[in-house]
Amino acid sequence: MRTRVYVEVMLRNNIVFRRLFTAQVAALLGTGLLTVALGLLAYDIAGSSAGAVLGTALAIKMIAYVFVAPIVSSLTNALPRKLVLVTADVVRALTALTLPFVDQVWQIYVLIFVLQAASATFTPTFQAVIPSVVPDTRQYTRALTLSRLAYDLESLVSPLIAAALLTVISFHTLFVGTALGFVVSAAMVIGTLLPKHVAAEHNRPTDGIRTFLKRHELQGLLALNTVVAAATALVTVNSVVYVRDLFGGSSSSLAFALGFYGAGSMVAALFVPRVLRSTNDHRLMLTGAAVAVAGTAAATAVSTLSGGPSAWIALATTWSILGIGTSMINTPSAIILRRESDETTRASIFTAQFSLSHAAFLITYPVAGWVGAQFGQFTAAAVLTGLATLAGLSAARLWSRTRDPVVVSA
């Protein structure tokens, strides 16, 4: 209740953040509609090969996030942040409007790369602006909570909105909704007075990554990114196998399982500001790593079940635990980025986090999918548990060499 009151006050009093948050929500809803529409478009063009098309599109997305983001950040270093954000939104909107007219798989790949390259420009730039807009540490923590809630709610709400719209329109029209989300986002940014951007004098694409590799504080965060990637890959890639193959459930049962993961994440995000009044972000995030490892370990046991009420309860509980653990890491991670950067280095640091965190998925997605397909879900969960455990222990060791962050009391 207290967290909700703080959030309401911040949204009411901080006009700039309110507009930027609205822009984020609009863009996220557009992205959610795009996910549904893209799946239907892939099936319309490729039929039974739609899964391969979407898998390739996901790989293209990760490549854009990992490799394009640092390059674009360096190229746009001297430009006003508003111009960068609005241009990225315009490119995304125009690309979304083009997708309904494609009739070849390769055209999907090209447009997805353009769209995801624009997203790889928008997201870290947006995240790097927020610390300047919300300078107070406590308020910034609440802003991160709101941002995390927006991501989790989008994953739950967007499919429902898409399903409702598809009862009255064709899936091609969903791309118009996607474009509209990006247009609203651009309009909100245009109408917002952003702090003046202080550009770094010499900015190279690898500057942020070099900084990550030099500092124990950021190296620890990099290790925790791997914990998140391991837990998230288990849920994202293999939920459908647990639900449909192991338990014999339906598509609605899959939504049920993913809903528990999202609910766990949202509950954890809501409590982060309160917890950080009594402990520091290192302890909170390392605890989150332990929770995530416990969740992946529990998944090995769940994979041996074959359905029935107890199996569904075990799955719901495990997925909730995974959501809680990943959110305990994700939600406060930007606090470390803010602490380890200044006005001139913030863009490169946030971009490096964006790039490196997604690079971890290039490892965990194949592990979850290929190991699960070849050796079974028990082995896949066990391998991901081992990977997450090693990453969590590495983070703890790295952070033991740094000074504990100061606890910010209420």
Which residue stretches match the model-derived regions?
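C-terminal transmembrane bundle of multi-pass solute transporters/carriers
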Residues: 66-78, 82-84, 244-410
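Substrate-agnostic recognition of the 12-TM MFS/MFS-like secondary transporter fold
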Residues: 19-35, 60-76, 80-92, 107, ...
